[in-house]
A protein has these predicted regions:
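Single conserved hydrophobic/aromatic residue that forms the stacking wall/gate
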Residues: 1-12, 370-379
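A short, aliphatic-rich alpha-helical micro-motif
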Residues: 5, 70, 81-87, 120, ...
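Short acidic low-complexity segments
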Residues: 73-87, 372, 376-379
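Rossmann-like NAD(P)(H) cofactor-binding subdomain of soluble oxidoreductases
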Residues: 82, 98-165
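Internal alpha-helical scaffold of NAD(P)-dependent oxidoreductase catalytic cores
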Residues: 143-162, 166-258, 282-286
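Interdomain hinge/lid region at the active-site interface
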Residues: 212-215, 223-321, 325
Length: 379
């Protein structure tokens, strides 16, 4: 591969001189930084100085890598944006949440682009991993990079997109054994990006034909799962009214070879319950109002209330007083084996139970808030 694109510092054949930066050290960014640090020099940047302090102390608040991995990692953790100037290859992995009205909140990715732009040098490549709707990288991020750096994209620096596929709490599917989608603004950039990720992704890379294709691929991955879970949730509501056990139905139907195995559940977190809104937002901007995607979202968003109402019905059937009933909820985070509480649907259950005069007791041993060097529980 030619080293002309990003200069000798980023030549893949000379790993000793390679410097890569990771902007955003959360559930997605941290595992990526640690993985690359085993191959090249890595600058791990995050605005949260307290989080950086934890990492430097060998504490992993995300629980994605583990304290021992953090302690032994060679990542250069920093909250000083000037350190980004040491790198020629930059990966941006910041959150992309939604606003209260379910419109995309691009503030984190715009902020990361602003910081990176201020410290971008000629010959660099910037790769975005944050989940966005098609067009964000080229139409929103690139102009910010150009404005802040005074450089010209395509001449002074290049961009690409490689959607994150980290599944928080999943110790089986890791960055090394999940096929990585990569894309670049041109063939030369795509080749460099592919070679860089191949350093850590043993499963290989898939070269998308364009940045927009890669962006679209990511946003439909989570949308597809959201829709399928919504279908299962709707079935569970129907079968519950019929007095039929949903799990038994799914077990029977699952004996057919082409029956997709999904299950009812609460859809929370920062991905599956959020990403569909990015796609429908862009669709509406183009004059198309989503039918299936938004229907699935409504079903999943209402499941917390449905669970609470069912609990109250069971209390009544058991002839237990509803008001001030002793109710325990085991688990508070948005999914099992993950300390992340963002968009957890347990909050919806609690709010609904309070409407009935019930103040539930919540227990979750994985739920930790690292607001200081000493973790405290979610209470």
């Amino acid at each position: 591969i030619s080293c002309s694109l990003v200069g000798s510092e980023m030549c893949i054949r000379d790993r000793g001189k390679t410097v890569l930066s990771l902007v955003g050290l959360g559930y997605v960014g941290m595992p990526i930084a640690v993985a690359f640090a085993k191959k090249v020099k890595v600058i791990g940047f995050d605005l949260n100085a307290e989080k950086i302090s934890l990492y430097k102390s060998g504490i992993d608040p995300t629980n994605e890598v583990g304290n021992e991995e953090i302690k032994s990692s060679k990542v250069e953790f920093t909250a000083n944006e000037i350190d980004l100037r040491k790198a020629k290859f930059h990966i941006v992995a910041v959150p992309t949440p939604v606003n209260a009205d379910h419109t995309p909140d691009l503030t984190p990715v715009e902020g990361a682009s602003t910081i990176l732009g201020r410290n971008l040098t000629k010959g660099s490549i910037v790769v975005y991993e944050s989940t966005v709707y098609p067009g964000v990288t080229e139409d929103i991020c690139v102009p910010i990079l150009e404005k802040e750096s005074g450089l010209k994209c395509g001449i002074d620096f290049k961009v690409g997109y490689s959607p994150e596929r980290i599944n928080p709490g999943d110790k089986e599917h890791r960055i090394n054994n999940i096929v990585k989608i990569v894309s670049g603004m041109d063939e030369e950039t795509l080749d460099v990006i592919a070679k860089v990720y191949e350093l850590v992704v043993e499963a290989g890379v898939h070269k998308a034909e364009s940045i927009k294709v890669a962006e679209a691929a990511k946003v439909i991955e989570n949308s597809q799962r959201d829709i399928n879970i919504a279908f299962m949730n709707e079935l569970s509501i129907i079968f519950n009214k019929m007095g039929i056990d949903t799990k038994s139905v799914l077990e029977a139907a699952g004996t057919k070879w082409n029956f997709l195995k999904f299950y009812p559940g609460l859809v929370g977190g920062h991905c599956i319950g959020v990403d569909p809104y990015y796609l429908t937002y862009k669709a509406e901007a183009l004059g198309y109002h989503s039918q299936i995607i938004l229907s699935g979202r409504r079903i999943n968003d209402d499941m917390g209330k449905y669970v609470a109402e069912n609990l109250v019905k069971h209390l009544i059937k058991a002839e237990k007083p509803v008001k001030n009933a002793k109710v325990a909820i085991l688990g508070f985070t948005f999914k099992e084996n993950c300390p992340d509480t963002r968009n957890t649907k347990i909050i919806d259950i609690v709010k609904e139970l309070r409407e009935y005069g019930i103040e539930p007791i919540i227990s979750d041993t994985t739920c930790l808030l690292y607001t200081s060097p000493s973790p405290r529980d979610c209470s």
